[in-house]
Amino acid sequence: MVVGTKKYSNLDFVPTISDSEDDVPILDSSDDEKVEAKKTTKKRKGKNNKKKVSEGDNLDEDVHEDLDAGFKFDLDADDTTSNFQGWNFLAEGESNKDDAEAFVKKDVDLDKIIRRKGGLVKMAHIDSKQEEETEKEKVEKENDSDDEELAMDGFGMGAPMNNGDENQSEEEEEEEEKEEEEEEEEEQEEMTLEKGGKDDEIDEEDDSEEAKADFYAPETEGDEAKKQMYENFNSLSLSRPVLKGLASLGYVKPSPIQSATIPIALLGKDIIAGAVTGSGKTAAFMIPIIERLLYKPAKIASTRVIVLLPTRELAIQVADVGKQIARFVSGITFGLAVGGLNLRQQEQMLKSRPDIVIATPGRFIDHIRNSASFNVDSVEILVMDEADRMLEEGFQDELNEIMGLLPSNRQNLLFSATMNSKIKSLVSLSLKKPVRIMIDPPKKAATKLTQEFVRIRKRDHLKPALLFNLIRKLDPTGQKRIVVFVARKETAHRLRIIMGLLGMSVGELHGSLTQEQRLDSVNKFKNLEVPVLICTDLASRGLDIPKIEVVINYDMPKSYEIYLHRVGRTARAGREGRSVTFVGESSQDRSIVRAAIKSVEENKSLTQGKALGRNVDWVQIEETNKLVESMNDTIEDILVEEKEEKEILRAEMQLRKGENMLKHKKEIQARPRRTWFQSESDKKNSKVLGALSRNKKVTNSKKRKREEAKADGNGARSYRKTKTDRIADQERTFKKQKSTNSNKKKGFKSRR
């Protein structure tokens, strides 16, 4: 509050509300102590401005030269919240593109090629009659949504699927139904065989109660933590700068996972936590980390926290989450170590020893081995986000190397939406009686997610046309964010070209793109420059882009866990969302659908989600498919032209590389060679071993006993004796008896 009355305008001492006028001291003023007022030098035009100048001159007489005239008290700083627009996917150095714009072209502009071929101009034409029919279908679907709910006795039961398929005769339908029944019987037999094998191997797969009691902290700790619910972040006894950062993000009430984990993490205990996608797991580990770092030694720069993540985009997002929460905390620094970005910039940043380093495993090991003055000797906290993915075969070697480099006396925090790792895989992490906190039932989708399934049958060739029609129905104006998941990078690229030729602007995200292209695709999608993003499972974990309304599974995932991560990109943080999945006829596809329906039925009391069968007008889709097939030559031309441009760019890059080698030969040769913890042969061997372990078949009890007998007998083969074996044994015994009898007779004669 500022006191600005004329009565006290010449006083150096300004009274407050609590001071009485009688107590105000009379201060003598001398000419020497007069402060010269700053005069305004800006020229102002107009009559109104002249008045402002005169008022400003009078005010300037009262302003001390050491004070900023434009300073204002922000009385409501703690209560105001910014309009949060999502996390930033620009890495350090990427946002300042003024200097970077001058660099040579590195990537092919695919949209430019598509426009040259007539695409991205206008949307593909749909007849008005068909549009009217689709509107009627929408109304019917809304009215009959309850009739379309899927039952547990198979896929499509309880839903009138494929009403629009008029070309199929009744005989063909009956034959298909018989085939499906036979397939289902075969699948059930396979499932029972698999179950039989698994039941026999319970000792190997499931952890015993004794092992859990020895490894984990008492269950009461986790149960008590889950019961605690806090009304706001103030009740968690967090510091004021952290609370201010949370308020700026609009965080008001802690989510269940945050209420359970933050108090335990502040105590320094190890945690293994799981909750549904979009429940605030990143903030659940970042808040206690920042709170603990407030009390670090101020004068000693060292890296105290390592956060490991499986993908680069997720690492960049988590880094931005941490920076936003710690924006009002002074002295906490962040470092990013991910592949695909400038290596030298990362080395310079890591030389300053940031408090928190967020990294992917490969680049983290690279920096530890090859970056000067970067070490992990003082690390106190290790965080593994998407921990179940990090513990899989692909990261096993890197993870073992990192565990050997980090100090053993540290706090470990493991988080994932599908955290179901066995003790055997967790032993290498050196956990110390971790507290196990599982907020939601395992393998459960978000509470407000509507899961829809489209049965493809034998129409795989119609999937591109189906995707186009579905996106047009779900988002005719192009104002919704839709994510499409595919199995292969080539499929994502081809679909982008097909959709572009049909007039739909889409982006792609997969491992074949450069890191700059990947970040550019995510940012364009986030800013709604491109409403549809076609991606592989690279984007299935962790990415939190606000207001993704629909997820489409163009290709079925390999497992139900991956399916949960995919559909978890929508219906986040209590919002509603929809997923549409194209289901084939394989047993794997059907098992995932069964698991999804089962999860919805088992958690009906806890969730508002539904599992529905979606009706499709296949006649209209076949018309669209004819248009797609007519573009096959154009698609091939675009792919060839793109390949040629890539070859030209690659040749130019090699030319520049050669020029640099000639110009800076001595500097380049003087650089030390970068080392790695594995040789090329070791990498190949680990890949082969990983493939063999993944393809290992489940054995039943008899086979397992035979294998155990072989192992005990040092490879000796055990089998039942045949008739010839028994005859041979009898002959041997007779010979032995004869020889013993003859020896006895000889001995008796010699005694005589």
Curated annotation (Swiss-Prot):
Record keywords: ATP-binding, Coiled coil, Helicase, Hydrolase, Nucleotide-binding, Nucleus, Phosphoprotein, Ribosome biogenesis, RNA-binding
Binding-site residues, ATP: 275-282
Annotated Basic and acidic residues bias: 124-142, 722-734
Annotated region described as Disordered, given as residue ranges: 1-61, 119-223, 673-752
Residue positions where Phosphoserine is found in the record: 208
Coiled coil: 621-667
Family classification: Belongs to the DEAD box helicase family. DDX27/DRS1 subfamily.
Protein name from the UniProt record: ATP-dependent RNA helicase DRS1
